Amino acid sequence: MSYFNDNDFDVFKSCNILRNESDIRQARKVIKDKLLDINEDINQKMNDMGLYHHKDTAHIVSLLTPCEFNHGKVNWIGIRYGKHPSEIDELNFGADKEDIYGFQKHCCFQLDVCYSGVEMGIFHAVPRGSVDRMYCHQMLDSGDADFKSRLIKAVEGIVGYGFVWNVGVDGLSMDDFKGESFVFDEVEDVGEEFVKWYSKVDCEYRYSSLLCHYGRKDERISSIEGIEDEFFKVVERLRGLYDVMCWRKL
């Protein structure tokens, strides 16, 4: 039997994502426990790479109940690794924001379970107040040639692995944007084209993530060992891009 099975994936059916009854909460907890077992296996190696989960162990796994932070729906559950908690605290100093959300306002590596399978990659930005989104747009808007060159080089290095950048809507968005995707493996002159696309499409009030999708029956995610091995591969492939697009306080 696969590590995540159809019962797990079906937790994210459209009829379930708004629910908060005891049976669906228990089904979500099963997924949470499996993700915590993955975290137990990979956390030290992630730390060795300078990547860390939320400082509060209660928030290693994303929220299991519909609330304001997930816009009232649970359509995926995952774990994230990013900047060291002390760095986030310093960057967030003086900001009026919830701590649980503060971590998510910074670019993170993500492994999540959804209805169609498993996703791995980078969660770049929440709709409002994302630190690294602001940094990237400031650098591009200022015409920083070195930043753009490094970004293009990093983008060119991730072609051929099935990565897709998705930008989705926030419920508070005031325009008619319905979401767009950039498929890296299908674009010529991918670096320059991505910069143009990102500059135009990625903006406040929109979610933004770079993910590789693994279908339910994908052999690479059939075991916990396979999932962990694949996640390390994804982190290695995307690390250069992550480093370029993250704002670090010097």
Model segments located where?
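Generic recognition of cysteine residues
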Residues: 15, 67, 107-108, 114, ...
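Aromatic- and glycine-enriched beta-alpha-beta binding-site module
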Residues: 72-152
